[in-house]
C-alpha cells in the first residue's frame, strides 16, 4: 500500500472539518411528525449525479415537503465535507466512499440512493489505447487525489498487477475541469475524467475556435468495463448517490419525498436530455447543454435505493478496505447508514 493513496493534505482538511460534527447532530430533533420545512438545500458537484437535483430545484419537485428548494454546487471533496458537517445543505450528491467515511466518523449521514454506476473514462489523444494496461509508462492527469475517481483507478491498476506510482506518471490536479484543460491545451495526452467533463472535452476539441489548436480526443479505457473484467462482476461501480445530513434525517417523510423526486427527475433527464443540459448549464459554469445531453446518453444512471444497493456497495467498500481502511473510516458502515435498523 502506498502512503500516497490517501492525500495527507486532504486528511488534514477532513480532521479540521470534523470539528464541526456536533452542529448538525445537536440540531437534529427527535423523531416525530415532520412539519413543512422553510427550505431544503440540495448540493452536488459539476457531475451527472447533480442533474436530477437541479431539475428538482428548478421545478419545485419538493413543494409538499418544503416551501423552497435551492441547489448549490460544491467544487471538490473537501468543500463537500465542510458543507455536510457544517449544516450548509440538507441533501448532497456525493461519492459513495465519502458518505461511508463521514458516517463512520460520527457525522449524521443517511444514504438515500446510489445513482451513478458508470461515468468514468480515460480520455486520450491516442485512439488505440482502450485498456488501462495500454497506458503503462504514460502520464495521466487525475483529479481529486485520494478520492473518487482516483481510488477506482488505483484499485483497477493494482488488481491487474500494475503499480500506480512506478508504472505510470500520475499528475494530480485539483478538479476534473483542470484535467480537461490540460488535455485541450496539449499539456497532457491522457486524463481520467467523469461525465459530463468527458463529453465536454470531446465537444470542445471539435468546435470552433478551440478545435483549431486542440488535439483530437477519444474515449480510451472505460473504467466500468475494466471493473467488470477484472472482478468478474457486472460492469458497474457504485460511484455516487445522494445522502441526507443533519436535522432532515429525522424526518422520514421528507427523505421519502426526496428519494421519489430524485428518481422521477432522473427519468425526466433521460427523456429530456438537452433541456436537462440547459438546466445544468445555468447552475454550473463551463458546462454546455449539448455536453450534458451527450453525458446522459452514455452514462449508466440508475437510482437504486440504498438498501438495495448495499450488496454492491459492500463489495466495493471491501476492496477499498483491503487497500486502505482509512478511506472508509476503518470499517464497513453499519445498517443505519443505509437507513435500515
Model-derived regions: residue spans:
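Short, glycine-/small- and polar/acidic-enriched structural segments
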Residues: 35-173, 189-195, 214-220
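Solvent-exposed, polar/charged alpha-helical surfaces in well-ordered, non-transmembrane soluble domains
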Residues: 51, 82, 86, 100, ...
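Secondary-structure end/capping motifs
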Residues: 247-323
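Short, solvent-exposed loop/beta-turn-alpha elements that line the ligand-binding surface or hinge
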Residues: 63-65, 227-232, 302-309
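Structured segments of extracytoplasmic/periplasmic soluble domains
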Residues: 56-59, 83, 138, 156-160, ...
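Conserved C-terminal helix/tail region of periplasmic/extracytoplasmic solute-binding proteins
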Residues: 314, 318-341
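Pocket-lining segment of extracytoplasmic ligand-binding domains
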Residues: 97-98, 177-279
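N-terminal secretory signal peptides
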Residues: 1-12, 23-27
Amino acid at each position: 500500500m502506498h502512503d500516497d493513496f490517501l492525500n495527507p493534505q486532504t486528511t488534514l482538511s477532513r480532521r479540521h472539518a470534523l470539528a464541526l460534527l456536533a452542529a448538525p447532530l445537536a440540531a437534529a430533533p427527535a423523531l416525530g411528525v415532520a412539519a413543512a420545512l422553510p427550505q431544503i438545500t440540495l448540493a452536488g458537484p459539476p457531475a451527472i449525479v447533480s442533474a436530477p437535483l437541479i431539475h428538482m430545484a428548478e421545478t419545485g419537485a419538493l413543494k409538499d415537503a418544503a416551501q423552497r428548494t435551492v441547489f448549490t454546487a460544491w467544487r471538490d471533496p473537501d468543500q463537500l465535507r465542510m458543507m455536510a458537517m457544517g449544516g450548509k445543505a440538507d441533501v448532497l450528491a456525493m461519492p459513495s466512499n465519502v458518505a461511508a467515511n463521514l458516517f463512520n466518523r460520527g457525522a449524521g449521514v443517511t444514504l438515500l440512493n446510489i445513482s451513478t454506476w458508470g461515468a468514468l473514462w480515460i480520455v486520450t489523444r491516442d485512439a488505440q489505447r482502450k485498456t488501462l494496461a495500454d497506458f503503462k509508462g504514460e502520464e495521466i492527469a487525475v483529479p481529486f487525489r485520494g478520492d473518487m475517481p482516483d481510488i477506482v483507478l488505483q484499485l483497477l491498476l493494482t488488481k491487474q498487477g500494475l503499480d500506480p506510482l512506478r508504472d505510470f506518471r500520475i499528475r494530480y490536479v485539483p478538479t476534473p475541469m483542470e484535467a480537461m484543460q490540460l488535455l485541450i491545451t496539449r499539456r497532457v495526452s491522457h486524463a481520467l475524467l467523469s461525465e459530463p467533463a468527458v463529453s465536454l472535452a470531446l465537444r470542445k476539441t471539435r468546435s470552433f475556435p478551440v478545435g483549431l489548436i486542440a488535439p483530437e480526443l477519444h474515449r480510451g479505457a472505460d473504467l466500468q468495463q475494466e471493473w467488470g473484467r477484472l472482478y468478474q462482476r457486472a460492469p458497474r461501480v457504485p460511484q455516487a448517490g445522494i445522502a441526507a445530513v443533519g436535522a432532515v434525517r429525522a424526518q422520514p417523510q421528507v427523505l421519502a419525498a426526496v428519494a421519489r423526486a430524485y428518481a422521477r427527475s432522473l427519468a425526466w433527464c433521460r427523456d429530456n436530455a438537452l433541456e436537462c443540459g440547459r438546466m445544468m448549464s445555468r447552475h454550473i459554469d463551463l458546462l454546455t447543454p449539448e455536453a450534458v445531453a451527450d453525458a446522459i446518453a452514455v452514462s449508466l444512471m440508475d437510482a437504486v435505493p440504498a438498501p438495495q444497493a448495499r450488496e454492491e456497495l459492500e463489495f466495493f467498500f471491501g476492496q477499498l478496505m483491503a487497500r486502505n481502511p482509512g478511506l472508509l473510516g476503518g470499517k464497513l458502515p453499519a445498517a443505519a447508514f443505509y437507513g435500515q435498523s
